[in-house]
Amino acid sequence: MSKTLLAVALALVLGACGGSDETPASAASDTASRSGRATGELNLFMWSDYADPATVEAFGKDNKINVSQAFYDSNEALEAKVLTGKSGFDLVIPSLSNAGRQIQAGAYQEIDKSQIPNYNNIDPELLKLMAQIDTGNKYAVPYFWGINTLAINTQMVAKALGTDKLPENEWDLVFNPEYTKKLKHCGISFFDSPTEQFPLALKYIGKDPNSTDKADLAAAAAAMKKVRADVRQFSSSAYINNLAQGELCVAIGYGGDLNIAKRRAAEAGNTNIRVLVPKTGVGIWVDSFMIPKDAKNIANAHKYINYTLNPKTAAQNADFVTYAPASLPARELMDKTLANDPSVFPDEATKANSYVVRPKPPETVKLQTQLWLALKAKR
């Protein structure tokens, strides 16, 4: 992440992101227990398509470790698992928006940085950003960062709108009934996550994307309700294949996932997928490796984190997932098309108009969830 982006991010996050000197509800294991004994297992719980399978296979083979993976498609699903204290996993990858309250709930063990020599490759500005919710960078090791945006099938959208000219504010495609009523027939997809979707709606109606004001949240819900009947699906992962296969013409999603959809469509001969980066701004997030409190294979967890921060590994993973890696030297090793793609590394003007998805207090999370469930149920 560039210093310009993080200067913006820090300004947005500082003072409201929840950085705290408070001790988590449950103390983490001490250094000795974090080191763990050598084992032959590693259990990962992560987003789908979030590492090149070849790198995972190579790690397992080179270290004689059996790596198992399970996948989630929303931060809410991950949070429900780790807050039980019985996740059954050694490594998870929550977003900045959720990690802070999970740390304070005592869901994670501290990271032993002495076991991660490649920690020095992490963009220092990213660490400053994460320190706003993880004081001293004790629990989280940045993995990827990216944007929440939208993508279209240009051919299908042009046919539905009767023109190939897009609105000046490209978010009109999903939030303005004038456009959604025309696009509903070819398929619109929203995030299936209030954490991700509400800030986009708040930004669109001119409110603080991280607002905790009840009236603002109600206004955002009302704005989405106006187009609810035109939304075909709510998804935080299925939109990838649906967009690639022509079952959707507009999808809100994670930038990298939308680029994966674009790549899969191109492999099938469809070159009509375009990932948009609205100049009015996008949502910015950071995902980090964290070790659950109940992790058993702790040494292997550290070993895997270190492996992913190797510039060559980080670049290979970044080329596969089409997100920006936390490893600063990796960008120079990435495919040049991706390294110069504004949907992977947004330009300065876009970053200046964007926001970081911040943690919310419990009462706001509860209200957002209530409004979200009502929206999905068309109430």
Regions found by a protein language model. Name each.
Residues 109-120, 172, 269-283, 292-295:
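Short beta-strand->loop
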Residues 287, 292-352:
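Mature extracytoplasmic/periplasmic domains
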Residues 17-21:
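Bacterial signal peptide processing site
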Residues 103-111, 135-137, 230, 261-277, ...:
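Ligand-binding "clamshell"
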Residues 241, 348-379:
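Conserved C-terminal helix/tail region of periplasmic/extracytoplasmic solute-binding proteins
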Residues 27-102, 241:
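Early extracytoplasmic/lumenal segment of secretory-pathway proteins
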